[in-house]
Structure formats: structure tokens, C-alpha cells
Amino acid sequence: MDVVSPELNSLLPDEIMDTEAMDEDPPASHLTPPPQSAPESAQVPMETEVPEIISICPTTASMQAISTNAKSTTSSTTQLLLTPSSSSSTTTKNATPTLPKIPSLSVPPNHQLIINKVAADGKSPGGAVIKQEGQKLLVAGLSKTGQPIMLALPHAWNKPATSQGSGDAKSQPTQIKMVTAMGKPVIAVSSASQLVASSTPLQAQHLKTLQITKKPPVSTAGPMITKLIITKALNNKVLSSPGSVSPVVTGRVVSQSTPLTPPRTIAIGETISTVPQNAATNSKVAISPLKSPSKLTVVSVTSQSSNSPQKSMTLPLNVALGQQILTVQQSAVTSPAKAGSSQSTTQTVKPVQTVTVPTSQFKTIIPLTTPPNVQQIQVPGSRFHYVRLVTATTGSSTVQTGGSTNTNPSIQPAKPVMMNAAVRMSVPIVPAQTAKQVVPKPLSSAAQVVTTSQTPQRLIMPATHLPQIQPNLTNLPPGTVLAPAHGSGNVGYAVLPAPYVTQIPQPAFVTLTSSSTFSTATPSQAQARLSLNGLSTSEANSRPRKPCNCTRSQCLKLYCDCFANGEFCNNCNCVNCFNNLDHESERLKAIKACLDRNPVAFKPKIGKGKEGESDRRHSKGCNCKKSGCLKNYCECYEAKIMCSSICKCMGCKNFEESPERKTLMHLADAAEVRVQQQTAAKTKLSSQISDLLTRTTPAITSGGGKLPYTFVTKEVAEATCDCLLEQAEQAELTNQPQAMAERLILEEFGRCLHRIISFAGKAKTDCPINC
């Protein structure tokens, strides 16, 4: 077991995990100090906000003959590569063990780590003997705090090869020591091949086991998702060629978040390509973790030759927080589901569809038959861009992961599709189909369309009226799902084809109501009269007289009460009325004609005599026949006058000596007197209360006298102040304390007020208060 240096041990916490070697030759050397980091040019930040699926291209680095400096290059995808290089000697057969410099690594915020092994290019394929001793990889921490992780290769990890030329170099089992300084789970992937170039065509691969034991940290946060992307450019048999063929790695990554799951096994299969160097292709593995995924499918991007050999190794990992399975094997056939873009000319890229279900939360890559229209979905709070495809297929699709075929069932039309968990607006569809719930999300770029394989594109419109369409929904393009307003409940929807609908109205709001929503008791005939007369309902409610019922006179005759009183018809029951402002000319002509016939036609019916109230009489007389002129509809009795000689009434009892009239009039007078007395009593009481509480107006008189506060004039106030000052001077001369002086002044002020009130009472002794 390796001995950790004191410098490194002082930096590590107590709960650091312990690793044990499974080698036959346990190394005795201790860890060397971490090497110095390379210049800042080797650090290239990873670009995570890309509009397509991230693809990783391998990188080959050309090494100098004797130089020990590692030069790292990156591809156009701006990925961060950690490239440990080994120094190879071409002049001597026995090379001294050297410790190459490892460029430092900075992990981006999305916790991606890419380790790329670079093949060394020697001058002579048969003149180099390689010794690898004391290599150490300094990897930045995958946690947020950025604590380092040490991947150390001890000095005696293999025996130096002594063969020359085409001799075989057999590597010994490798011991890798991983040290982490954080309480987060870290995945370490190691390969069985040597980390440096070998000049021999035959390489013996060995299996090595890495045991990692770690105490689970006490944390309340959710599981941390780490993305690990490994790209390798393996050695080639011909070292004189400038490039090498990278292997195709296909795999399936399943993340288990349960802390009590059994240990899982990591199997890594490598492929050394034997095709010529001019047919170099790129190996890309895209791993895009969800926010909290439980299944993740890794799909190979490039194809490979069927005759290439395969090497595998097993690394059991025991992680306390959760076990992860990484199975990377070689597949002889091309995977039908491919993602990303490739630089190879023989590869065919197929668009994929991503369907995310929040309950089980798995991500499946499904190939499509035809390239459809692609819609970009902006998910708030996510670092990745998702692409939504609007055309679906009915057949089942296969995803090849590690040589096994997984057949996914066909997408059902009634399957709920979740596009954004934050928006939960359920829109029920009521056609003669299977009901489904669609979660719409307003987009500014394209419309959201619910499509199935059997039905064409449909537009969902409500069958019932909506109270109001929201202004932010009016800017959506055609084909957008309209949700009902809050409080309307479950309403029916009519599904119409999209070609029949041109666009959604663009005003700020559109109110869709029915006639049942109007809450008014006004009949339609009265509404027509209101529109003709131009009067409001509030004015009609305050109307004091009876409405007219004219039907043929157009309200232009004297028997129309409105016309006879010189008023316009207001809220009347008349038909074809001309007694309004709209027919002012016809009305003026009718008035002139009536005045020509009777100059006093428009005078009041009850006129005054010359000598007083007793001479009041009706101008035309009444025409009562059955009431005896003792009802209110008799104009003479209503006006409290007796019928005169001009009246044409029959059985009249409204005369001076009539006992019936006297009885009725006495009762009416008694009632009127009683009402007047009650009104006077209420008025007197209210006036007295207001006088006692407020006394705001001095205009109230009491029989010519004055109220007490009217005597407080300017002179009286000055005299009162003089009395108060005199009392203060006397208290000062007698050396009275301050409290006693204040008391004397207040007593003097009370005596002054008492004098004012008594003087006012003497002035109005003969005039009692009758206010």
C-alpha cells in the first residue's frame, strides 16, 4: 500500500476513502509531490450552452523527441482535455524514469471531466524502450468547492521492458490510487491499456480492481449529477503515420440514487483499430444528464470495423452514496439511434425525439423515419437546449446499448407529454378519440401542436364562451392551445382542422358573452324607447308622474299628459312617440296649433284666483262619474279644491256642505296636522342636539336674544387675559410655588367664564331658547 506524503495528508479530511491494491507486486514507493501545472493555454473552458447534442472529438498530440513537456490540443468543440504524456527516448535503449508534467485541469460548473490519452510519436518504431514509473494525475475536484483528486501511478507499477526493436513489452497489473478530499461521490474510470505509447504491436491487457471505501457525508442536498466523458486516442501499430483511428465506444449509463443498492460492476471494453491511417474517424460519446434522471442512454455516433479486436476489464466500485453502472463495449453493427454530428463521410445522422415523463423520469432516444420540422424548447433554469419534434412514428424503435437491443413500445396518442413541469394547465380534448391532457407552454417562435400518427394537425378551440381571452395569449400564432379561464370549470372543446383557422384576433382583449349574462329587468320595448328618447334608466326611476299610453296621437295631443304639461315623454308606454328631441320640429308645430285653438291650453289646470287661496279652481273641470269626486284620480279632489260649475262630474260629493267630503277632509287634515307636528318635533330635537354638540353657527336666535358664546368678543377676551396676568403677578409677589400659581390662574379663568355666562343669562331672561 502506498504511503501518502505528509503534505498531501495534511490537506485531506478524516473521512478520506482508503484504496487497496490488487497487484501481486505491492509498490513500496511513496507518492511524489504534485507536479506543476502547465501554462494557462492548456485550459480551455467547456462550452455547455450549445443548441445541439454535445459531441466529443478525440485529440491527438504530437510529442517532441526528448522533451518532457505535455502539449494539449483541443478540437473545435471547445472541450477540456486532460492529456498525460510520457517521455520516450530514441537515442538510448535504457531510458531513465522521468515524471511527465501534467497540465492542470479546471472543471466547469456542470461537472464534466474529459481525460484524453495522447499517443506518443517516436522517430523509430523499434528503437524505444519505455519505462513508466511514478506517474501521477492531478485532477480537479468534481464538487463545487474544487478540491483536487489525485490519480497516482506508483513507481514500480510495471517492470521495464528490455527487449529492443520488435520485442514484446508485457505490462504488469496496474495499481491506481484515487484520493478525494471531498464528501461527494467520484467516478474513476481506468483502462487496462498502458497510458503511454508502445512500439510493439502486441499488447497484453490485464484486469485490475479498484476498491473505494468512503463514509457517506451528512448532507441534506439532493444527489449531485456528474457528467464524465472519456475520449481516447489509442496506439497504432504504425507509428510513422500522423494520426490514429479512435475506437467506437457504446454504452449505457444507469444512475441509481438509492443509497442502499448493492455494488455495481463497471466493465470497460476498448477497441484497437487495425484499419489504415488515412481512414481515421472520430469517436464521440454524448452523455447529457437530466436534472434528476434515473435512466440515461448513451449512443455511439461512429461506425467501426467488424474485425477489430475487443478488450475488456472490470472495476468494482463501492460507493456509499450510490452505485453507478458504466458498461462500454464494442458493437459490430451500427446503432440505429444516433445523436449529434459526425465528421465521417460514411455516417448517416438521424434526427431524434426526446420524450420526458416526470413520473419515472427516463430519457429515450427514438429515431424518426423522415426529417421533420424541429422546434427548439427553452427550458428555464436548464443548461441544455432541448429539441422537440412534432412528427411521431407508430413503429417501435430500438436503441442498442452495449450489444443488447431494447425495444421501446410505440407512442400512444393518449400519453401525456410534459414540456415544462412549472406550467400545469390541463386542457381536455373532447373529440371522438382517446382523451389526452396537453401541457401548453407559450412560445414566441413556433406554435405548439398536438400530433398523432393517425390524425392530422388539429387546432383546439373552446365550444363554449370564455369570459375573456388573456392579452398575453393573443400574441400566439395559430395552432396554439387555448386554456379556459379560471373559474369556468370543465367546458367542452371543438377540435377544428388548422387550415380552417387563419389567426387569433389581435386586439388587447376579446369578450365572448351570451345574452344570458345581461342582468336587467328592462323589456325590449322600453329599451327601444330609451334609444329614441335618449334618456337613461336612472332618470326614469326618479320620474314623479305616471307614464302615458298613447298609441295613435304620437304624443302630440293635449290628452297626452306629458305633452299637456310641456314635458318630454320619459319611460312611457307610448308607441311611435314624437314628443322628444329627435322630432323637435313636429312637436313645435303641434304646440303652435294647440295655442291657436286655446291660448290657455298649456297653463296649469289648477289656477289661483285673484283674492287668495279660496278662489283656486280647476281650469277645465273634472269629468268624474262614479267616484263622487272623492278619489285621488279626481283632479279637483287631488288638488284639495271643491268642484266648480265648470266641472262635468256626476254624483259629485266634493262640495262645501257635503258630509262625506267634510269627514274625508277632516281626516285628511287631522292626518296632515299630525304629520306636521311630528316633523316639527323631530326638527326641534335635532336642532337642539346639534346646538349642544357643535354650536357651529351663531345665526340661531332665540326670540331676539343672544347665546352665551356670542358675548365672547375681542374686548371680553382681552379683559379675561388681563385678569389672568394680574393673578399671575400676585402669585409671583407672594412667592407662591408654581403648582399653586397655576391653580390660581385656572380659578381666575373659571370666574371669568362664569361672569360671561351669567351676563348672557340676564340679557335673555325674557327670551327663552326655542332653537
UniProtKB/Swiss-Prot annotation:
A molecular-function term among this protein's GO annotations: metal ion binding
Chain residue ranges for the region called Disordered: 21-44, 68-105
Annotated function: Component of the DREAM complex, a multiprotein complex that can both act as a transcription activator or repressor depending on the context. Specifically recognizes the consensus motif 5'-TTYRAA-3' in target DNA.
UniProt-annotated stretches for the region DNA-binding: 546-559, 622-635
InterPro entries (UniProt xref): CRC (IPR005172), Lin-54_fam (IPR028307), Tesmin/TSO1-like_CXC (IPR033467)
Region (Linker): 606-619
Any one GO biological process: regulation of DNA-templated transcription
Protein name: Protein lin-54 homolog
Pfam annotation, one family: TCR
Gene: lin54
Residues binding Zn(2+) 6: 629, 643, 649, 652
Binding residues for Zn(2+) 3: 555, 569, 574, 577
Keyword Nucleus: yes
Positions marked as site (Interaction with DNA): 597
Compositionally biased tracts (Low complexity): 72-92
Record PTM Phosphoserine, positions in chain: 288, 292, 308
Protein family according to the UniProt entry: Belongs to the lin-54 family.
Protein's organism: Danio rerio
